[in-house]
Each structure stands twice: as structure tokens, then as C-alpha cells.
């Protein structure tokens, strides 16, 4: 049955492709917004991830990648993690459908950086504007929660970030930086697209700045029939942010986000020779209030945040969970002495959860009375510049405290060396950690309330060389060793696991001629773990952006994966995806666009039993007022 549906799906895709070919003189974003810096990378790129203050990427000893809104939009994806997967070296996101990740059994959206992330993802920390994001009960982010419409850029820290960001930043950090209006005025955008598998995605955004006041509101609706029957998915999302500059030194801001996700999954049961349909109905919300300050020699912020979730799942018996999380983030950056900057910070968070029903029962295995964990952690960092910024030393220390797991010390040290204007050598050592989740501590037969945190030590070296606008290269080698990894033995969770991951990462960008931007990346990873899912041994990206005419733009990329482990009974996956995008700027107010994905019609899967889509096509418009 599944095979027949796959052939019918390919026929429908071919028809859709033919339908949209005349429309392919189309768009993702107005070329008026393009500049030479769009793809040329970025020797002076400024980031906040890894330091809590705006810092040149090459002044940090850690590996931080940046993906801007233009690059996200060229993928044609509205779900952020789908747009990011494969774009950053050593970062991989599991997927299972044309749209929608899902949760629980059969769900995808697992994130791994350099093979670290866990299953589900509780070893990579998702953040929005520096605010940690994960469901309190299961300690992992909900992948469908994040969309691209409100994103200015994304900063990805490859390697541990626990000194600054605490638990769950064991393998890396994905920090989503939201848009801010830079000039007075009102800007409204409506974007809508339709394509394969009756997929429709639309979003409305409004950005305002007037004097000291600014705001951003985005609303979106996405839906699809899915690549097989009864594999439908839909979500409604809202993001709102306001800010007010109290004075030249102080700023007040607040935000709120809400998403409702509904989906069906017929495949998981089929893999177990059953016939039920998994139904999911997930509602999650987050809000925060932040007060920031900025003086000549010091700046910082105080943020209060709260998140909550209400999950209903039938697989096939009814499951219901509730969770929430409250936290405080405080830090202050100070120019300690000449050419030295320090940060003193403190984090507090308490997360709670309960499962009133599991397996259709209000008692027994799988249900959970109200549980909570509280964490509080001070930390310090110091960065010293020597010899007119030729050598920069960096270090930090966090004292991680928890009412459940005691106290743990987390150090990081590194340096950045600039012998010439165009050469940079960086090296660092950092420790990361992850506290066990409620699921591992209290749920289901393997649970063990006596678990300790997992930890990792990471060592890396990066060489960067900028030849000119024609060529910029980054090469990174790393070695990571994990300890106290939670694994199930003899029917019980224990801290008996360990691993060693090592690898190589290469990034190249170039602008050989005007109006042509090239980029390429490659990553290799070897792990001592032989059954590590969502962590390909080899991964590469080759991409180009070409503007042959003033209003016409072409984006092309080839993504390749090799040695991807799925399951013992499945051959390791090796595939290449050719994706093509077109943009036509009709007027200053409207763009047309189309995206053709998997033109190689690769036959592959990432989650066991879930075939990925073949050739797909989406096309639509973007109205700017």
C-alpha cells in the first residue's frame, strides 16, 4: 500500500512540476534588498552567541555560524529547522514529511551537532533572543514551534555552550535572533505559497517603528495532506514583540509566541503491523519581559520568561501532559580594565510537569504526579586582548546548581590569534552538560530517579583565511568525549554510556564576479557509537546565488549525505538533493517565487520507515506594503 501511494505521489508531483514551470520566473525576496555582503562571508560578522554581547565572530575562540534571513528564505522552507538542516557543517535535523516534524512515537525534528544531541533532542539548546526554549517535561524543544517569518538571522554555536547557557547546551546552541525595525515607518508583508501534496503556507507580518517604540507581529498558517494518505499536518502560529527605549541607556521589551499543531501519522503503526492512526494536538506558548541597559563601558540585561505546553496524543490510547517553566536571566558585561571585557551572570529556572493520563488510564505506568526541578547558576567570563588584538584570550566558569543534581563546575578556555589581517587561528576547550529529563527520571519502566547529569569535553582548532572577496575559508577540527551518558541496561536507565566523536569541518565562500555568490561546506564525523541516528558520517553543500538580470534571481544548491545510520535492518543512507529556486521582482511591492526540491528524485529516508518526498514544487507571492 505504501509503495503504491509513493508512485501516485510521484505522478502528482510531476503534474505539479509541469504546472509551475511557467511560473518559475519567480521569487523569494526582492533583489533590491540584496547586497554584496549577502553571501560573501563574513570576516567581520558580529554575533552575540558565545559572549552575551555583540562581538566579531573571529574574535571568539569558539565556532559560530550565522545564517541570515535571505539564506533562510532561499530554501523555500517556513519551518526554521528544515531551512537550517544541512546548511551548517556538522548540523543535521531529522525529517519525515514535506511539512511537519511531529512529536512522540514516529516524530522527527531531532537535532544533532557533531553527533551530539540525544534522542529526543536534549543536548542542543534552542534559544530565541537568548531565551532558552524546551518543553519542561521532556527537556527538548518542539521542532514545529519555530518558523522563519520573524527571524533576522540564526547563530549556531558548534560545540558546548554550557558556561554561558547552562544545561542542554552540551553539544551546541541555536540562537534565533528576531527582526527589529531599523527605521521609522510601518512595514507589512504577506507571503503565500502552494504546491505539492496540497501544501499551503501563508504568513502575515507587520513591523513598526515610531520614535522610541517598535513592534513586530507575525501570524502564520501551514497545512499539507502529506506524502501518503492520512499523513496530514497543520499549524497556526503567532509571534509578537514590542520594545520601548526608556532613555539612551535603558530599553524595555516584551514578547509572546503561541503555536497550535495538529497532525496524523499512519506510518508508525504500519511498521508494527497495526492499523491505528496517531493523532497529535499540541499547544505551546512562551512569553518574556526584558530590561536592558547600555553605557559606554558596560551593558547587560535582566529577563523574566515563562513557557507552557498542553499535549494531547492518541497512539492509539489517550495521552495528556502539561508542563511549564519559569526562569530569570541576568548578566552584565563590563570593561574590566584596558582591552579586557568581563561578564558576570546568573540564571534561575524551575520547570514542572505532570501526566494526568497515559495509555488511556489515569493511573499506572506512564502517568506522573506533579514533579519539579529548580536550577540556579552564577557564571563568569573574561576576554583579554593583547598586542593590539593580535592575540585574544578567553575563559569562563559556571557553577551549575540544582535541587536535584547538586553542584557541577563547568570551565571553558580558548584563544584567537591574528598574525595578519587575513589569517586567524582559534582554539578552545569547553565542558558541556545536560541534566536528566523527567522522562528518564520518573517515566516508564526504565526510569531511574538516581541519575546524574551527562557531560562532554570538547577540543577544537579553527583556521580562517580570507584571500579577498574571491575566497574565504574556514577549517575546523574537533574531538569530543562524552561521559555519564544515560543508556538503558537490564531494563533500567543508568549513567554507563560514553562516546568519542571527532571530525573535520570546511566552509568556503566566494564572489568570483559581480552578481554571483558561491558557497560550499563539508563535514566529516567519526563516532565510537555505531548506532547513532541523525548523524551522517559525511555531509556537504554546494550552493550558488546568481542575479543574471536586475529583477531576476536564481538560487541552486546540492546537498549530499553519506553514511547516515537509520536502523540495524536498514542500509546506511547515501543521497544527493538538487534544489532550485527562482525569484522575480515584479515591482517594489510584489515578488513571485518558486522552489523545486529534490530534482534528483532521490529515494531516501531519515526516520526508519518514513520515506522522504521525491520531486516537490512550491510557488507563490510576497506582497510588501
Question: Locations of the language-model features?
Answer:
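Flexible loop and strand-edge segments within Gram-negative outer membrane beta-barrel domains
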Residues: 224-231, 235, 245, 249-325, ...
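Short strand-turn segments of transmembrane beta-barrel domains in outer membranes
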Residues: 173, 177-208, 219, 226-231
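Conserved C-terminal beta-signal and adjacent last beta-strands/turns
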Residues: 19, 230, 243-246, 427, ...
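Membrane-embedded beta-barrel scaffold of Gram-negative outer-membrane proteins
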Residues: 213, 299-313, 350-353, 418, ...
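Surface-exposed extracellular loop regions of Gram-negative outer-membrane beta-barrel proteins
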Residues: 269-270, 359, 403-409, 415-417, ...
Amino acid at each position: 500500500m505504501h509503495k503504491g501511494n509513493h508512485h501516485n505521489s510521484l505522478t502528482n508531483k510531476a503534474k505539479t512540476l509541469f504546472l509551475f514551470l511557467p511560473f518559475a520566473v519567480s521569487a523569494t525576496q526582492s533583489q533590491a534588498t540584496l547586497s554584496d555582503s549577502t553571501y560573501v562571508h563574513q570576516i567581520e560578522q558580529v554575533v552575540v552567541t558565545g559572549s552575551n554581547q555583540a562581538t566579531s565572530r573571529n574574535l571568539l575562540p569558539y565556532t559560530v555560524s550565522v545564517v541570515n534571513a535571505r539564506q533562510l528564505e532561499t530554501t523555500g522552507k517556513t519551518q526554521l529547522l528544515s531551512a537550517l538542516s544541512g546548511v551548517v557543517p556538522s548540523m543535521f535535523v531529522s525529517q519525515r514529511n514535506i511539512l511537519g516534524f511531529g512529536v512522540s512515537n514516529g516524530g522527527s525534528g531531532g537535532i544533532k551537532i557533531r553527533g551530539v544531541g540525544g534522542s529526543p533532542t536534549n543536548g542542543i539548546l534552542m534559544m530565541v533572543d537568548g531565551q532558552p526554549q524546551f518543553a519542561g517535561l521532556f527537556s527538548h524543544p518542539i521542532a514545529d514551534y519555530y518558523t522563519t517569518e520573524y527571524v533576522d538571522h540564526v547563530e549556531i554555536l558548534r560545540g558546548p555552550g554550557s558556561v554561558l547557557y547552562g544545561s542542554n547546551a552540551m553539544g551546541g546552541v541555536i540562537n534565533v535572533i528576531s527582526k527589529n525595525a531599523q527605521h521609522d515607518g510601518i512595514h507589512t508583508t504577506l507571503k503565500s505559497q502552494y504546491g505539492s501534496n496540497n501544501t499551503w503556507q501563508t504568513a502575515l507580518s507587520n513591523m513598526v517603528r515610531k520614535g522610541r517604540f517598535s513592534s513586530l507581529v507575525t501570524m502564520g498558517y501551514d497545512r499539507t495532506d502529506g506524502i501518503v494518505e492520512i499523513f496530514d499536518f497543520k499549524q497556526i502560529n503567532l509571534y509578537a514583540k514590542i520594545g520601548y527605549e526608556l532613555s539612551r541607556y535603558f530599553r524595555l521589551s516584551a514578547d509572546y509566541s503561541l503555536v497550535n499543531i495538529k497532525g496524523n501519522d499512519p506510518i508508525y503503526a504500519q511498521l508494527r503491523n497495526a492499523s491505528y492512526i496517531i493523532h497529535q494536538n499540541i499547544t505551546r506558548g512562551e512569553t518574556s519581559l526584558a530590561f536592558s541597559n547600555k553605557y559606554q563601558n558596560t551593558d547587560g540585561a535582566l529577563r523574566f520568561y515563562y513557557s507552557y505546553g498542553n499535549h494531547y496524543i492518541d497512539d492509539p490510547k489517550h495521552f495528556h501532559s502539561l508542563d511549564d517553566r519559569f526562569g530569570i536571566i541576568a548578566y552584565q558585561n563590563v570593561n574590566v580594565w584596558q582591552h579586557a571585557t568581563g561578564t558576570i551572570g546568573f540564571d534561575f529556572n524551575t520547570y514542572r510537569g505532570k501526566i494526568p493520563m497515559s495509555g488511556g488510564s489515569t493511573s499506572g505506568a506512564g502517568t506522573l504526579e506533579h514533579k519539579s526541578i529548580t536550577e540556579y547558576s552564577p557564571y563568569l567570563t573574561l576576554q583579554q586582548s593583547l598586542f593590539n588584538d593580535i592575540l585574544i584570550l578567553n575563559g569562563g566558569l559556571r557553577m551549575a546548581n540544582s535541587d536535584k543534581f547538586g553542584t557541577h563546575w563547568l570551565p571553558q578556555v580558548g584563544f584567537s590569534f591574528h598574525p595578519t589581517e587575513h589569517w586567524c587561528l582559534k582554539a578552545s576547550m569547553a565542558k558541556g552538560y545536560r541534566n536528566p529529563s523527567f522522562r528518564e527520571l520518573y517515566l516508564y519502566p526504565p526510569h531511574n530517579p538516581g541519575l546524574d547529569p551527562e557531560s562532554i569535553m570538547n577540543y577544537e582548532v579553527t583556521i580562517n583565511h580570507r584571500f579577498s572577496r574571491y575566497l574565504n575559508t574556514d577549517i575546523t577540527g574537533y574531538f569530543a568525549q562524552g561521559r555519564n551518558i544515560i543508556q538503558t541496561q537490564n531494563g533500567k536507565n543508568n549513567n554507563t554510556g560514553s562516546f568519542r566523536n571527532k571530525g573535520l569541518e570546511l566552509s568556503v565562500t566566494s564572489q568570483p564576479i559581480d552578481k554571483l555568490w558561491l558557497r560550499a561546506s563539508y563535514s566529516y564525523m567519526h563516532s565510537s557509537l555505531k548506532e547513532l541516528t541523525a548523524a551522517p558520517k559525511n555531509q556537504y553543500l554546494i550552493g550558488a546565488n546568481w542575479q543574471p538580470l536586475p529583477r531576476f534571481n536564481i538560487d541552486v544548491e546540492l546537498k549530499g549525505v553519506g553514511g547516515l545510520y537509520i536502523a540495524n535492518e536498514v542500509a546506511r543512507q547515501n543521497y544527493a538533493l538538487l534544489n532550485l529556486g527562482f525569484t522575480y521582482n515584479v515591482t517594489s511591492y510584489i515578488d513571485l517565487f518558486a522552489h523545486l526540491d529534490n530534482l534528483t528524485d532521490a529515494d531516501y529516508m531519515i526516520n526508519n520507515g518514513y520515506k522522504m518526498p521525491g520531486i516537490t514544487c512550491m510557488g507563490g507571492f510576497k506582497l510588501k506594503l
